[in-house]
From Swiss-Prot:
It holds the Pfam family CC4_CEP85. Belongs to the CEP85 family. This is Centrosomal protein of 85 kDa-like. Residues 439-682 form a coiled coil.
Length: 805
């Protein structure tokens, strides 16, 4: 692999001869290392020309993969003038012909003969080399503008690693069992191709190799056409850093973050490892260049092979922005909280139904969070793949343009700057016309064939991996669909349960309202106490009323007697008045006839008159007093009549209240008796359920006497109750059908205690009686169920009516 360009150095800079050494590594071929004495001797350049021939090196990876996802660890500055041309100074003294020590090829003779026939001289090779370098330089000039990516893309191998063998380990060591000879030959073949990739301003290595042109005809005319050969000289990173301050003013500056892949570490196994870096634009299968789509698939396969997704954390695998990573962490914390709630909720003392519902909700939340997280990861990987596809295509196009355009411009500037220098110099060193020997060409062909085989193997491996990934994707999609169906079914179940719970809650509320309206035992007791108190008050009032009536009758009798006395006195008064008038007439007559009356008669008449006056006065006084008493008695009679009317009204009200309370008491007593009866029946049914089998019971009953009075009485009671309940239900159903309000006592099963039982058949055998008893119990249960359904429906209707009102 042509991995480096060697820049000319001054002889007194780092070494006397100006030759600089490189460490052996996977980016350097063993045929061009100083340990094998394969470095070409460098020429000495004056100090004033040192900053003119060095060009800025873009910071990229050593792999030569157009800078996708990788970056160089050591920044190398571009040393060039404002014109951008290179000025080479030829050797001032006799320079020996440089020799490239090449290992002997073990390839077949047919391949070497074919290469000798195809390349008889070095001129054809040099022209093809210049075209390839030009193509590379143009592509890299275009790609240099779009390679400033400040996001760190970590742990992603470069595109050139597709040429690495399949049995490479994670440390980069090769496990293929080949001989050192074959590895060195492959390294030499790759060293040739690596030189074609590293020319131009966007070279992707730690150090550069600069071309030095020397005239191949020193003793001929200096004005003749220069047929140049390429010499290589190593220049270290310190030489490029020395003039970094003067060359930061270049218009195109590409910066990349450092990657550990750009700094290879030399190990014992890597000394004989073939270089892994080969530009994808120069790979070919059967002489035909590889298409960009195939190249992209090869690169993605290598990415997945070298750095699988399971081994990467969120920072290294996705290379996201900090705000996106924060969102993912928040989402994961949010998905972990339901699990904590689920594990912690078991310690709380909730009802079992509520715990089940909370568990379902937490499980649903956790599963939805995991599904969303996986969807986010899948979408992000798809976006990364599409983004990498686009960058690969763009960078390949730019690399091709740079390769086409860059080297032609550099070659023109080199020739223009070297021609006056060669005219002024007197001593020039002849160089051989042959650039690459036939053995090297055979090695290159062998390397090309091996790379083609590797490319085919990688294509097959890529197809297999793609098929596996498609199958895994289908499986994941099926799993997601099944999970979605499961989640939808769970949601439907939750909705049904919630609806059922709501219906039950409504039913409970209506029943609670209905039961709240019914009186309780305390209310019944308080009402009974009030009833007793009111009854006592009523008795007292009735007694008082009787006494007052008796007194009234006595007073009436007294009034009648007094009225009769008054009538008699009025009659007497009239008689007295008449007597007085008669006496006055007599007096007048006597006065007229006074002369004739004697004196004794006059005195007697005067005495009688005085007596009569006194009697009249006393009688008038008695009459006035009796009249006053009569008026007073009339007033008392009127007041007593008002009191009697009021007492009658109060007694009527009390009687009505007493009647209502008596009805309530009767209804409550009936309800209590019915409840007691029902509890007795349930206890009896439970006792019957706890008894042994029916056959044993029949055998026991057969041993009893035929006429078991207790069973007959119980049967009669049950049949009478069922008959009463059936009648009540029929009446309730008729009332509901007619649109009337049902009787609550019948609806609740409250009945009076004086319910007579009907007579039954004369067959009183124990077996028939037990069968009838079981049938009656079943009928009883059916009636209870019918009553509950009707009462629930009525309560629901009442609740709906209350809600609407």
């Amino acid at each position: 692999m042509w991995g480096r360009f060697l820049a000319p150095e001054a002889s007194g800079r780092d070494s006397p001869g100006g030759a600089r050494s490189f460490p052996a590594g996977p980016d350097y071929s063993s045929a061009w290392l100083p340990a094998n004495e394969s470095l070409w001797q460098a020429t000495t350049v004056p100090s004033n020309h040192r900053n003119n021939h060095i060009r800025r090196h873009s910071i990229a990876s050593d792999s030569g993969d157009t800078g996708i996802g990788t970056s160089c660890s050591d920044s190398v500055e571009d040393h060039s003038t404002s014109s951008g041309t290179l000025s080479f100074k030829p050797s001032q003294s006799l320079i020996t012909l440089p020799t490239a020590h090449v290992m002997p090829s073990n390839s077949s003779a047919s391949i070497s003969k074919l290469r000798e026939s195809l390349t008889p001289d070095g001129s054809k090779w040099s022209t093809s080399l210049m075209q390839t370098l030009g193509n590379h330089s143009r592509g890299e000039q275009d790609s240099s503008l779009d390679m400033k990516d400040f996001r760190p893309l970590r742990k992603w191998s470069s595109l050139s690693k597709l040429t690495a063998p399949d049995n490479c380990g994670q440390g980069g060591t090769v496990c293929r069992e080949e001989s050192r000879n074959g590895l060195e030959k492959i390294g030499k073949a790759k060293a040739l191709t690596s030189q074609l990739r590293t020319i131009g301003p966007s070279c992707l290595h730690d150090s550069m190799e600069m071309l030095r042109l020397e005239d191949k005809e020193i003793n001929k005319k200096r004005s003749s056409t220069l047929d140049c050969k390429y010499k290589f000289e190593s220049c270290s990173k310190e030489d490029f850093r020395a003039s970094s301050s003067t060359l930061r003013r270049q218009p195109v500056d590409m910066t990349y973050s450092a990657l550990p892949e750009s700094k290879p570490i030399m190990t014992s196994s890597e000394a004989f490892e073939p270089p892994k870096y080969l530009m994808l634009g120069q790979q070919a299968v059967g002489g035909v260049p590889i298409q960009p789509s195939v190249r992209t698939q090869m690169w993605l396969t290598e990415q997945l092979r070298t750095n699988p997704l399971e081994g990467r954390n969120t920072e290294d695998s996705y290379s996201l922005a900090p705000w996106q990573q924060q969102q993912i962490e928040d989402f994961r914390q949010g998905s972990e909280t339901p699990m904590q709630v689920l594990t912690g909720s078991s310690r709380q003392s909730y009802s079992p139904g509520y715990q089940d519902f909370s568990k379902w909700e937490s499980m649903l939340k956790i599963k939805e969070g995991l599904l969303r997280q996986k969807e986010i990861v899948i979408d992000r990987q798809k976006q990364q793949i599409t983004h990498l596809h686009e960058r690969i295509r763009d960078n390949e196009l730019r690399a091709q343009h740079a390769m086409l355009g860059h080297y032609v411009n550099c070659e023109d500037s080199y020739v223009a700057s070297l021609q006056p220098q060669y005219e002024n110099t007197s001593l020039q060193t002849p160089f051989s016309e042959e650039s690459v020997s036939h053995s090297q060409q055979g090695e290159f062909e062998q390397k090309l064939a091996s790379t083609e085989k590797e490319v085919l193997q990688l294509n097959e491996f890529l197809k297999q991996r793609l098929s596996l990934f498609s199958e895994e994707k289908k499986k994941l999609e099926e799993k997601l669909k099944t999970r979605d169906r499961y989640i939808s079914s769970l949601k439907k179940k939750c909705q049904k349960e919630s609806e059922q719970n709501k219906e039950k809650q409504r039913r409970i509320e209506t029943l609670e309202k209905y039961l709240a309206d019914l009186p309780t035992l305390d209310d019944v007791q308080s009402q009974s106490l009030q009833l007793q108190i009111l009854e006592e008050k009523n008795k007292n009032l009735q007694e008082a009323l009787i006494d007052t009536e008796k007194k009234l009758e006595e007073i009436k009798k007294q009034c009648q007697d007094k009225e009769t006395q008054l009538i008699c006195q009025k009659k007497k008064e009239k008689e007295l008045v008449t007597t007085v008038q008669s006496l006055q007439q007599k007096v007048e007559r006597c006065l007229e006839d006074g002369i004739r009356l004697p004196m004794l008669d006059a005195k007697q008449l005067q005495n009688e008159n005085d007596n009569l006056r006194q009697q009249n006065e006393t009688a008038s006084k008695i009459i006035d007093s009796q009249q006053d008493e009569i008026d007073r008695m009339i007033l008392e009679i009127q007041s007593m009549q008002g009191k009697l009317s009021k007492e009658k009204l109060t007694t009527q009200k009390m009687m009505e209240e007493l009647e209502k309370k008596e009805r309530n008491v009767q209804r409550l007593t009936k309800a209590l008796l019915e409840n007691q009866r029902q509890t007795d029946e349930t206890c009896s049914l439970l006792d019957q359920g706890q008894e042994p089998d029916q056959s044993r019971q029949q055998t026991v009953l057969s041993k009893r006497p035929l006429f078991d009075l207790t069973v007959i009485d119980q049967l009669f009671k049950e049949m009478s109750c069922c008959l009463f309940d059936l009648k009540a239900l029929c009446s309730i159903l008729n009332q509901r059908a007619q649109g009337k309000e049902p009787n609550l006592s019948l609806l609740l099963g409250i009945r009076s205690m004086n319910c007579s039982a009907e007579e039954t058949e004369n067959d009183h055998s124990t077996e028939t009686l037990t069968k009838k008893l079981s049938d009656v119990c079943q009928l009883r249960r059916d009636i209870d169920e019918l009553r509950t359904t009707i009462s629930d429906r009525y309560a629901q209707d009442m609740g709906d009516n209350c809600i609407t009102q």
